[in-house]
Structures are given as C-alpha cells and as structure tokens.
C-alpha cells in the first residue's frame, strides 16, 4: 500500500513538473505533408532532407498528429509531417499550435512541399513562393449537364456560372482566400531568386516536350506564384484553365496560379485561428511549393495518361524545396537577435 501511494505521489510530481516546464521558444517550424518509409536513410519524402541536413535528431511524440515531431538539439527548429489532404493539414496544424510544449509566438512557419506546377508559369524543379493561398469551396455540376458555352462545371457558391466578373469571399466559410505577408514573401524571394537549382538530364528531356510553353522548358528557377489547394487531385488542360481563372477571381486579379496541392488552405485556416488565439503570428508564415509534375498533359498526349504517369521530377522537386526553403530559414534563425522582433521586409 505504501509503495502504491509512493508511486501515485511520484506520478503526481512528474505531472506537475511537466506542466511547469517552460515551453521551448521555437524559431522556425518546418511543415511537410508526407514521408515515405523512414525519416532518414531511404528514399526521401518531403521531411527527410530536413531531418538529415538540419539534424532534427530528437523525436517527440505527437498525439494529435499523424507522425512524430522532430527537433534539433537546441530546440529552436521544429519539424512536422502533417499528413496529406485538407483535413489532415488543418487538424495537424491546430494540434501543433495548441501544444503546450512549444512557444510559437515568434516562430516563422515554412510550409514546404512538392506540387503540380502550371506549365504556363514554371517548370519541373522550380520553386514558387506564394503570396496567396486559394481554397476550393465551390459548386459543381457534371460538365455534360452544363450549358454548352461553359468552359467547365465548377463555379463559386454565390454565382450561377463559372468565372463571374467578380466575387466576395463569404465570411462564413473563411476558406477560399488567404493573403500572406507580402513583404515577407518578397524578402524570401529576393533571398533566393538567384539560387542555381538542381537539374537532371531526364527531366530536361521531358520538359522539352512541352512545346509552346517557354516557362515549362526552362531549367528550374525560383519564382513568385500562388498556390491552389484542393482535395480533388485534378489534372489536365481544362482543369488548369479552371485553376488559373479561380486564382485570378479570388485574388481580384492580383494573383497568378502557379502550383496545385492538397493542404495549404487547411494550414492557413488553422493558422488564422491560432493567430486569433495568440498562439502564432500569421505574419510569419511562408509557403514554398516546388514542381514535381505539370498540372496538364504535354502536347500530343492525353490527360489520363499524364495524370497516371510517374513523377519524373519528384526527387528534383524535393531537392529544390530543401535548398530554397533552408536558405531562408537559415537567414531567419541565424539573425535571431533581429528577426525575433522584426519581421524581414516590413
């Protein structure tokens, strides 16, 4: 009985100590969406290069997430794998932001992953800094039942046809337009625009098949371009036109569709709520997506073949994501005496 009481008392003291421990003041959060196999030593997903090259060696349980967290020995850089799709992105970000182990009030959050890229705007292996994140809340009818002059069957919830002249984002769903800190995004772009990104002969040969798409044929480069998040894994010429129109519509002509992915509006929705709770600072968020594949088929091929093909640029995109993202993160964390209280570019 005495042993039981002692065990209970020690457990109570341990709980008090855990709650009393000061949260770690994180400087940078690296947000990725998937990893394949192990975090180190095998074929990489989005997380592995960060783990290996930034020495995120300490593994932390993450009960509200889908994958353990990792941190460096100084507890200044924190890495998360969110899981793919909007629901996982939102839930994982909320779980991280509410975790009492971490002080994220001054942390810079880098959302860093691969994506489809619009061949009108960029090439496989290229890296796009987003100024806007656009969501996919919409109405849709099968285009076979749509009027013949409709370009596609998707349109805003407050409209009666695709691509109306203008739109307002209804407050109640808070999910289709997220504007990032333009000054910080421009600063990040300026820090990386001259980087020489890795290339690959096989990828270069594939790019060359995108005739009449000069941006798609370029070697990998850094650009400013916005991202469209959707739980639909869509593909093709018609859907790329839809995405281009959709981004332009929701940003009132200021945005340019560059990349397509399945998470970022979920991340930003959670971050907005965490910002209102004083858990994070939404002005310290960056979104970097790199092209692993094109969002539409190359000339002379069809969309089904294209969407079903392996990603020829996956490894290239992963390397670009780390190179460009880490360049900015290193600048932020090594100049912490300045960047802690003063956001670059502002």
Language model feature labels by segment:
Residues 7-15:
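Bacterial N-terminal signal peptides
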Residues 21-346:
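Accessory terminal and edge-of-domain segments that mediate assembly/interaction
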């Amino acid at each position: 009985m005495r042993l039981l009481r002692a065990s209970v008392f020690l457990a109570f003291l341990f709980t008090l100590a855990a709650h009393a421990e000061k949260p770690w003041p994180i400087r940078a959060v690296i947000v990725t969406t998937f990893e394949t196999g192990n975090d180190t030593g095998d074929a990489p997903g989005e997380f592995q290069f960060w783990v290996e090259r930034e020495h995120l060696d300490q593994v932390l349980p993450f009960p509200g997430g889908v994958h353990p967290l990792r941190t460096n020995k100084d507890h200044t850089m924190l890495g998360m794998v969110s899981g793919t799709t909007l629901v996982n992105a939102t839930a994982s970000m909320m779980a991280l932001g509410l975790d009492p182990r971490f002080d994220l009030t001054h942390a810079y959050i880098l959302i860093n992953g691969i994506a489809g890229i619009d061949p009108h705007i960029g090439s496989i292996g290229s890296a796009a800094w987003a100024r806007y994140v656009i969501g996919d809340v919409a109405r849709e009818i099968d285009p076979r039942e749509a009027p013949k002059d409709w370009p596609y069957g998707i349109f805003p919830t407050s409209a009666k046809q695709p691509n109306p002249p203008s739109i307002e984002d209804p407050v109640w769903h808070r999910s289709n337009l997220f504007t990032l800190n333009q000054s910080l995004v421009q600063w990040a772009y300026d820090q990386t625009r001259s980087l020489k990104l890795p290339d690959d002969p096989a990828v270069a040969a594939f790019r060359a098949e995108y005739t009449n798409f000069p941006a798609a044929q370029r070697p990998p480069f850094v650009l400013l371009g916005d991202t469209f998040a959707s739980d639909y894994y869509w593909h093709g010429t018609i859907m790329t036109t839809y995405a281009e129109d959709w981004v332009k519509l929701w940003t009132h002509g200021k945005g340019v569709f560059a990349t397509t992915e399945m998470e970022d509006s979920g991340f930003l929705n959670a971050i907005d709520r965490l910002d209102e709770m004083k858990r994070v600072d939404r002005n310290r968020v960056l979104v970097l997506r790199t092209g692993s594949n094109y969002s539409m088929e190359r000339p002379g091929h069809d969309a089904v073949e294209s969407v079903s093909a392996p990603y020829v640029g996956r490894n290239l995109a992963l390397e670009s994501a780390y190179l460009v993202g880490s360049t900015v993160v290193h600048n932020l964390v090594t100049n912490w005496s300045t960047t802690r209280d003063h956001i670059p570019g502002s």
